[in-house]
C-alpha cells in the first residue's frame, strides 16, 4: 500500500512538471502571437487583458520572459518584465507568476485546491519580497505584481487567477530584465517543426531543403546559464503583461511608494 502511494505521488509530481513545461512553451508562443496580431488568446487574456490592452503590446519598448528564476530562497515559475521607456528612469511592470496545476478542473473549491491556493500564496509573496530587496539601482517606477495561477493539466487552460497586492519600487527596468534573465534556470525546448531554409552555393542555383530542430529541453542548472535565459529574452522585441486587481491581499508588502500601483499602471494607457 505504501509503495503504491509513493508511486502515485511520483506520478503526480511528474505530471505537474510536464504541465509546467508545456505551459512555459505555450506562454512563449502565445505572447509572440499576441505581439504579431495585437489580440490576446484565451490563455493570456485572464492574465494580461484586464490591465494592458492588446494594442499596447506594439508600443512597449521591450519585454523579457524568464522561467524558474532562482532568487535564492524562492524560485518563481515565471517572471515577465516590461519596459515602457529608455534610460534608468523608465517605467516598467514586473509580474511574478506561481503556477498550480489541476488534474480535475470542474470544481475549483475542493479541499485539495484550497490547500494548493494557500500553499502557493506564500512562495509568490516571498518571491516579490526577495526581488524587491535586490533591485538594481535606478529611478524608474516599476510595479511588482505577484500572481497565483491555476492551470488545467489537459488543454493548458487558465482556470483561476489570484493577485496579491502589487507594490511600486524604483529601479532600472532594462537592468532588472537582464538580471532576472540571467537567473533563469529553464528555457522552453526548441520546436521540432521542420523549417525551410535556402542554401545558396557558389556557382549554382539556390536549393531548398528542410531541417528539423532538436527538441531537447534545457536542464536546470545552478547558477543559470546566461545563454538559456537569453534565448527566451530575445524572442519578443515588445510586449506587456497585466497588473490587475487585488484579489487576495493576504500579506501587506513593503511599501516603497505611496502611489497607488494600479492607478499608476492604468494611467500609462490613458489617452493624452
UniProtKB/Swiss-Prot annotation:
Source organism: Equine herpesvirus 1 (strain HVS25A)
Family: Belongs to the herpesviridae UL24 family.
InterPro entries assigned: Herpes_UL24 (IPR002580)
One GO term (biological process): symbiont-mediated arrest of host cell cycle during G2/M transition
Protein name: Protein UL24 homolog
Annotated keywords: Host G2/M cell cycle arrest by virus, Host-virus interaction, Modulation of host cell cycle by virus
Amino acid at each position: 500500500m505504501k509503495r503504491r502511494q509513493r508511486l502515485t505521488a511520483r506520478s503526480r509530481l511528474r505530471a505537474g512538471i510536464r504541465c509546467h513545461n508545456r505551459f512555459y512553451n505555450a506562454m512563449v508562443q502565445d505572447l509572440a502571437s499576441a505581439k504579431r496580431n495585437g489580440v490576446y488568446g484565451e490563455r493570456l487574456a485572464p492574465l494580461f487583458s484586464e490591465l494592458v490592452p492588446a494594442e499596447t503590446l506594439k508600443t512597449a519598448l521591450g519585454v523579457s520572459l524568464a522561467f524558474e528564476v532562482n532568487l535564492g530562497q524562492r524560485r518563481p515559475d515565471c517572471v515577465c518584465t516590461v519596459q515602457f521607456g529608455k534610460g534608468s528612469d523608465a517605467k516598467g511592470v514586473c509580474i511574478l507568476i506561481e503556477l498550480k496545476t489541476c488534474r480535475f478542473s470542474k470544481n475549483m473549491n475542493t479541499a485539495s485546491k484550497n490547500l494548493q491556493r494557500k500553499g502557493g500564496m506564500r512562495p509568490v509573496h516571498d518571491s516579490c519580497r526577495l526581488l524587491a530587496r535586490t533591485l538594481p539601482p535606478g529611478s524608474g517606477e516599476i510595479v511588482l505584481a505577484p500572481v497565483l495561477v491555476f492551470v488545467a493539466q489537459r488543454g493548458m487552460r487558465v482556470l483561476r487567477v489570484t493577485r496579491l497586492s502589487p507594490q511600486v519600487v524604483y529601479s532600472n527596468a532594462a537592468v532588472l530584465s537582464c538580471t532576472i534573465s540571467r537567473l533563469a534556470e529553464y528555457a522552453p525546448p526548441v520546436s521540432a517543426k521542420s523549417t525551410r531554409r535556402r542554401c545558396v552555393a557558389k556557382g549554382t542555383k539556390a536549393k531548398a531543403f528542410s531541417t528539423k530542430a532538436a527538441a531537447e529541453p534545457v536542464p536546470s542548472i545552478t547558477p543559470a546559464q546566461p545563454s538559456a535565459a537569453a534565448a527566451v529574452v530575445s524572442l519578443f522585441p515588445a510586449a506587456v503583461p497585466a497588473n490587475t486587481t487585488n484579489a487576495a491581499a493576504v500579506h501587506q508588502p513593503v511599501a516603497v511608494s505611496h502611489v497607488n500601483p494600479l492607478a499608476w499602471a492604468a494611467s500609462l494607457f490613458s489617452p493624452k
